[in-house]
Structures are given as C-alpha cells and as structure tokens.
Amino acid sequence: MTQMTPSDVPSMGRRQFMNLLTFGTATGVALGALYPVANYFMPLRAGGGGGGTSAKDELGNPITASGWLSNHPAGDRSLVQGLKGDPTYLIVEGSEAIGNFGINAICTHLGCVVPWNSGANKYICPCHGSQYDANGKVVRGPAPLSLALAHIDVEDDKVFVSQWAETDFRTGEKPWWT
C-alpha cells in the first residue's frame, strides 16, 4: 500500500474552491432554465397604469392607437400580439376608437389560429370548421367554448392588453380562461 505525502493531498482551500465552483455552475444553469418558465407565467408589464402588456404588431413593435386607426377602417378586426404573445384581435369600433375588448384568436378545439371572415361576419376555424360570432362566442362546434377575451386599454396613444377576469358578457358566466 502506498502512502500519500502531504504534498499529494489537495489543500482544503482548493477543495472548497472546487465545491463552490461546482455549486455556482449548477445554480446558474438551473436559474437560466427557470427564467423562461417564470416569464411565461408572469409576462413583463410594459408601462401604463392599467398594468397590461403592450400590444405589438407582427414584427414585435408596440402599437400606437393613432397609427392603428389610420391604417384600419371601422369594423376592422386585425391580429396583434397580446398576452403571452398570443394572437389577439383588435376591433376598430369607429374612426377614432379601438374596442375595449380583444378576442384571443386561438381556437378552443385544437388550438388553431382562427381567421376573421368579414363576408360571413364571423370567425371560422380552418382546421375543423368551428365558428364564432363577431364577439367570439361559439356558434358551431366542434369547439366546446367561446374564444377568450382580453381587456384593451389605450393610454397616451399606447395600446395595452390585460387579462379579462370579470364575467363573460357573451355567456353571463365566469370566464373559463382565468
């Protein structure tokens, strides 16, 4: 059996340093992996007293109410990035007004994006034919539920989207998406 000389045994300082380095690396990796998960459940808030998320166009740029209204006629329903980046319809109610609610464009059947059909005045899902009226209430299945709602607020020409937690005005029931 060979005996180790004192110079062969690592010093306690070196051992502590290696333990600290290993622990720090593992902690950094774990926190880095948890960051996107935390952002998914707690999206960053973009200014505004309403506490909502800034509505963004297809390029990810924040939308201004004046710019949106100048490019979209009354009655228009166009997609923006809403809560958690979900496609959400902004409704133009007049030449100077964006509706106070938006409609999440994700079908409640299998999650397809539901386009607005202006000729039929309803949303029609291309995947399995579910249909929703102009306010997003389901009128024909197989979708089991109406499209989710979101609050739309305009503050200082900025458009914000926030969670709808009140009674669903289309059904008179508690919202299924909260």
From Swiss-Prot:
GO terms for cellular component: plasma membrane-derived thylakoid membrane. Its cofactor is [2Fe-2S] cluster. Disulfide bonds join C112-C127. It is an enzyme of class 7 (translocase). Binds 1 [2Fe-2S] cluster per subunit. [2Fe-2S] cluster binds at C107, H109, C125, H128. It catalyses: 2 oxidized [plastocyanin] + a plastoquinol + 2 H(+)(in) = 2 reduced [plastocyanin] + a plastoquinone + 4 H(+)(out). It comes from the Bacteria. Keywords: 2Fe-2S, Disulfide bond, Electron transport, Iron, Iron-sulfur, Membrane, Metal-binding, Thylakoid, Translocase, Transmembrane, Transmembrane helix, Transport. InterPro entries: Cyt_b6_f_Rieske, Rieske_2Fe-2S, Rieske_2Fe-2S_sf, Rieske_Fe-S_prot, Rieske_Fe-S_prot_C, TAT_signal. Its EC number is 7.1.1.6. Component of the cytochrome b6-f complex, which mediates electron transfer between photosystem II (PSII) and photosystem I (PSI), cyclic electron flow around PSI, and state transitions. Belongs to the Rieske iron-sulfur protein family. This is Cytochrome b6-f complex iron-sulfur subunit. The gene is petC.
